[in-house]
Amino acid sequence: MSDRLTRIAIVSEDRCKPKKCRQECKKSCPVVKTGKLCIEVGSTSKSAFISEELCIGCGICVKKCPFEAIQIINLPKDLAKDTTHRYGANGFKLHRLPIPRPGQVLGLVGTNGIGKSTALKILAGKLKPNLGRFNTPPDWEEILTHFRGSELQSYFIRVVEENLKTAIKPQHVDYIKEVVRGNLGKMLEKLDERGLMEEICADMELNQVLEREARQVSGGELQRFAIAAVFVKKADIYMFDEPSSYLDVRQRLKAAQVIRSLLRHDSYVIVVEHDLSVLDYLSDFVCCLYGKPGAYGVVTLPFSVREGINVFLAGFIPTENLRFRDESLTFRVSETTQENDGEVKSYARYKYPNMTKQLGDFKLEVMEGEFTDSQIIVMLGENGTGKTTFIRMLAGAFPREEGVQSEIPEFNVSYKPQGNDSKRECTVRQLLHDKIRDACAHPQFMSDVIRPLQIEQLMDQVVKTLSGGEKQRVAITLCLGKPADIYLIDEPSAHLDSEQRITASKVIKRFILHAKKTAFIVEHDFIMATYLADRVIVYEGQPAVKCIAHSPQSLLSGMNHFLSHLNITFRRDPTNFRPRINKLESIKDKEQKTAGSYYYLDD
């Protein structure tokens, strides 16, 4: 019996359409043929029901289902117990819970759809854990008995008896536009229970947007408002779901400092974050989540920050002797980096001249530069310094006479914009067929781009129903599939989880090398930027007023230039070479600043 309990059947209610198929799963099931009701499809039911007790794990129904709605998953043996919550029969289930500790920041790291948001809801007291018994959910007394002897018991006793107040920053800040009416300043005044509104507005640079309404501000401003709205509340548990999306590097670190300032000896702070360098800087300890997205998730025991992130990247949990990913993820700096600028001159292929562009009150000056084939140039700068404007200038989006002082060469350009909120009614298959039919038929493109980005699973879904991360993967595929000289990609990491970011980086890098093209990329995730960059363009100046885009320079000198303005130093982790931010005023931080080496390549 123990063998059978470690198998779960997942039926996706979105994909399963019993009225549109011949119920192939039921007809082909060998257990049903023996007369047992392993798979049932009622005349009124919206999806099939699979009995996990009767299922023998043959996997025939998985192959036969025309909508790919079924997953049969064999779990590790020790997952027969410790179920915290399950969303109904054949639904997602979560094993164990992260363990928050008062006075410390708990970081959660894991892929999308693995149960991080479910864990947050349970810890916030918004969702009562059913311990896997969705038909007869237990009461709080039974739940506390289940967790007895662990740190979670004392935590849940406080949640139930003391009515702990929770303040949550949601994952998708775009929804604030639909909910909040009136200007942001008045909204923040209403929420201010700690009298800290002026302080947080100065810290998060919100003073200039307080008179505006939610629908008039950018994603980054909305994110900073959402963090401020949680900060001014008087609460016992503070939760932040992806606080760094839409923010630039400087704002991410400021947000991290603001979140850490919420710590009291009796308060809990929990953060879900996909930018690993920010998570590293922010957290005191980390819980990893692994499993199969949309099917089941397992929470590990707490690790120290460095060890936890390294465990996640290695894909192996030493405490449980369990491998949850086939390969480990490491960060070697770009193999094609040209260190000295003289080397580029010898085979420079393209040049662009000095340019200026006036857009309303904003003026951008671009210093002349050059680039070669098979090269990725990453643009580093704060929000509002004209990175997207420069991309559009190269793409020829502005008329020639409108302030460009000298001719820009004619480049055939493929452009992926920053936002990708597509409202198209067609399926992903139709969209790819319309836009990049030739590329999709090419086996090299299939193996280099479509399979690693897992686009095949999305083919029959309607574009407007996709999640943010799924839309982002489709947008990257569309951009790379279009034949062009230059690929301009604006924030490829937005909405992607840590694992998908690394996959997307590898896909872009491999494609650019194979196709012998050039890519200009805007990226705020530091780990992804350093992995991608062959050369960097640094932007400096006053955002939204006047900025300068410097000529492309080597990764080391460009990063040093950029980080010296931000007053941050990085070191490299000896295990997997990922960049780690030094704590401000630490010995390592002072040493590197004295030596003038803000960024390390040689560890």
UniProtKB/Swiss-Prot annotation:
Tissues where the protein occurs:
Expressed in roots, stems, leaves, flowers and siliques.
Query: Which regions span the lipid bilayer?
Result: none
Q: What is its main location?
A: membrane
Tell me which residues make up the 4Fe-4S ferredoxin-type domain: 7-39, 46-75
Intracellular or extracellular location(s): Membrane
Q: Where does ATP bind?
A: 110-117, 381-388
**PROSITE patterns (UniProt xref):** 4FE4S_FER_1, 4FE4S_FER_2, ABC_TRANSPORTER_1, ABC_TRANSPORTER_2
A cellular-component GO term for this protein: membrane
InterPro entries according to UniProt = 4Fe4S_Fe-S-bd (IPR017896), 4Fe4S_Fe_S_CS (IPR017900), AAA+_ATPase (IPR003593), ABC_transporter-like_ATP-bd (IPR003439), ABC_transporter-like_CS (IPR017871), P-loop_NTPase (IPR027417), RLI1 (IPR013283), RLI_dom_1 (IPR034348)
Q: Does the keyword Transcription regulation apply?
A: no
Which UniProt keywords are given for this protein, alphabetically ordered? 4Fe-4S, ATP-binding, Iron, Iron-sulfur, Membrane, Metal-binding, Nucleotide-binding, Repeat, Transport
- Pfam family, any one: Fer4
What the record says about family reads: Belongs to the ABC transporter superfamily. ABCE family.
Q: What is the official name of this protein in its record?
A: ABC transporter E family member 1
Native species: Arabidopsis thaliana
Q: What's the gene?
A: ABCE1
